[in-house]
């Protein structure tokens, strides 16, 4: 099994961590969840804008028009898909002050699971494609996606457990969204393999960079602010950028990057 596929599977499996936290009642503080989302956004923004997009533009045979065009395509494509999908957000189910009937919780959890699954599928493709092109960047994206997936698993499993009383059902429902990400990676592995040209890979990387920027700005940072409105998610973003930038410098200095 390829390393990029393993990274994608591990990132998707992080959803189960959140699911177990949801059914065990060991809910992390809102401050920690918000910081982790900001941290993930910082990692994605730095990798996308400082590594992936420049690498795609520098690829042999890649034109600036195609490179920037694919970046904008990924950016706008994410926003378009995000607007079309059923929209129930994790924070809607994580607020203890909201009292919902079991039927209402079930319905909201179904919509949330569906929406998250559809969002996670392209994230799996993005993780695999990035790791296939540059393993160093793949580790960073996998870490960011994993941090993003933990609150999602928590948000689905907690309400389902409250509605059904079944820990197994709650973990299963939460796991579906993580499996969607893994399926995305498997699909990319089966279709792309090693038979893809450098220009096509660079174009895909540029589009993935656009998707990651849109995800960070439109989903992760606003979600962090809603989960913990008393603190600025920018601290997590800056910390994520700093840690990722420092780690990239260390890897490149060691000759790994």
Curated annotation (Swiss-Prot):
- Residues binding Zn(2+): 123, 148, 152
Q: Name one GO molecular function term.
A: metal ion binding
User: Ion transport among the record's keywords?
Assistant: yes
What is the name listed in the Swiss-Prot or TrEMBL entry for this protein?
Answer: Zinc transporter ZupT
Instruction: Specify whether Membrane is a keyword of the entry.
Output: yes
**Chain positions recorded as Fe(2+) binding sites:** 120, 123, 149, 152, 181
**Where is the major localization of this protein?**
membrane
Residue ranges crossing the lipid bilayer per the database entry: 5-25, 32-52, 61-81, 109-129, 137-157, 171-191, 195-215, 236-256
Q: How does it sit in the membrane?
A: Multi-pass membrane protein
In the UniProt record, which is one GO cellular component term?
plasma membrane
Q: Which PANTHER family match?
A: ZINC TRANSPORTER ZUPT, ZINC/IRON TRANSPORTER
This chain's function reads: Mediates zinc uptake. May also transport other divalent cations.
- What is the reaction catalyzed? Zn(2+)(in) = Zn(2+)(out)
Report the leader peptide range. Answer: none
Q: In which organism is this protein found?
A: Shigella flexneri
